[in-house]
Structure formats: C-alpha cells, structure tokens
Amino acid sequence: SNERIEIPEGVTRALVVTAHPDDVDFGAGGTVMALVKAGVTVTFCICTDGDAGGFDDSTDRSEIPAIRRAEQVAAAAVYGVTDVRFLGYKDGYPEPSHDVQRDIVRVMRQVQPQLVLTQSPERNWERLPSSHPDHMAAGEATARALYPAVRNPFAYPELRNNEGLEAWTV
C-alpha cells in the first residue's frame, strides 16, 4: 500500500507489545519502519518465547526459545530497533492475568512511551488466524495495562516501592 503513516505529534518513544516473536514483523513491520525513520525510539515487548511455534520436528524443542529470541532480535535490528524485551511466558498459555498485566506495566513505566501498538483483543471470525488466543490475550493485557494500571500509582505498588517505577500516562 502507498498509504502514508501519520506519526502523532510529540511521539518520541513507542512500545510494540505482541504475543510471539515474529508477530511484530507480520503485523506492524511497515509501521515500525515508519516510526524509526521518523526518529521515534521503538521498543518491542514480546510476551512469549514462541516455544510452540513451527512444524519442524527435526529441531530439539528445548532450543526453540533461544532460536526465536535470536530471530526476533535480528529482525528488530533490520528496522533499527535495539530494545527487545521478552516476558518469557510459555507459548499458548498467556491470559490477560494480573501477572501479564503487571509485566507489561513494568515495561511501560520503564520505557515511558507516548504510543503503544498491540494486537487486537477481539476475535475476528472472518480472519480466524488473526484471532490466535495468545494474540487476544496480549492485546487485552496491554489494554488493561494502558488503562487504568500504568497511570495509577497504586496499581502494582511493588513496581513503585521495590523498583522505583512511577506511574506513567501514555
């Protein structure tokens, strides 16, 4: 498409939250490239290691997380993204739980983005593969983290009290 991506004024930091390594590349690669070209510092937050991905039985499954992480870091470098964070949840198991929300809030408070991109938390029956349960969980956990948790200094007080991470409004 030749559509131009408009970067909102004042955006200098963006956070992209997805379920799996490679979700950024399939879902938001062009947007990430436009952000980086506009001078925005982009951070990736990947909820799982993608350990259940692929259909190759010849690879030792215990090696998959390291492979998927390395692939994502290499792909990020192509865009000019150097900050890639992995939450380490098991592929196929994320829920929009308080643990996942807290971990996303932590990253948001560390990065302090003005823009957050994530996957849709809604099921799309017309495009079922886009409605992977992990994608929906990452999207819902991110939405809950965005409001109200990240801006509420009393949400996940351990982040403030133990890690010095103050509330942040995206």
Where are these regions (language model features)?
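Active-site rim/loop-helix segments in enzyme catalytic domains that contact anionic ligands
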Residues: 1-112
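Metal-dependent de-N-acetylase/amidase catalytic core
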Residues: 1-17, 95-170
